[in-house]
Amino acid sequence: MKTLWICVSAGLAAMTAVIAPALADADADLIKNAESAAPPAVGGGATIYAPQADGSMKTLREGSNGFWCMPNDPATPGDDPMCGDGNSMEWAMAWMSKKDPPKGKVGLIYMLAGGSDASNTDPYATAPSENNNWVTTGRHVMIMNAM
């Protein structure tokens, strides 16, 4: 039994030694992609979040400048990383929850790598279709909730 435990422990340690660097490389690639959405002074100090399949957000890196960035969404046809300020995150969370955005708060989102934006007619579209006017845009910034 002791020999089995030693073998299992050694196997788990070996797997960790192989998997951990691969995960770190994947996170580094996501961080680099996310940072590409904004000027270096913004992206370099931003908190980096990666959306997970269950709808939660994984923090890849804590930031220091009040901005956040997210890497490309693989569910969209193009590369679309983005970075924004705190007010834009409140707007985005309201949009994802299908709720009204916060009143009286203007946010800024950078998409300097361009974007593959959802529909111009359906803000909850998840794929291009014949009737939803899916658009691909170049480098841009978005002012959120400026009403």
Segments and roles (model prediction):
Residues S9-A17:
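Bacterial N-terminal signal peptides
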